[in-house]
Amino acid sequence: MSWRGRRYRPRRCLRLAQLVGPMLEPSVPEPQQEEPPTESQDHTPGQKREDDQGAAEIQVPNLEADLQELSQSKTGDECGDSPDVQGKILPKSEQFKMPEGGEGKPQL
């Protein structure tokens, strides 16, 4: 008796397209059509073009001032802690006694 290996049977319940999702066809980028120049390409150093004027008007915001303003608005009081917080010392965690079973408030 000769041994026969298992024959390959494709699964019928799931298709590859269902596992992976819809296949995208590779797209070939179309060459972009350049617009014919309306003015001559010659640019003399003394002349300004319309494109150059827009670049000169861009302003960089002051990042340091913005960061300082944000940090002050998040912390609240600029001079430090408020008077009701100053002078209070938090108890150490070793001084707390937790009640049995985790019910109730911790005792000091």
Curated annotation (Swiss-Prot):
Residues 40-52, 94-108 have a biased composition (Basic and acidic residues). SMART domains: GAGE (SM01379). Pfam families: GAGE (PF05831). Transmembrane segments: none annotated. Residues 20-108 are annotated as: Disordered. It comes from the Eukaryota. InterPro entries: GAGE, GAGE_fam. Belongs to the GAGE family. This is X antigen family member 5. It comes from Homo sapiens. The gene is XAGE5.
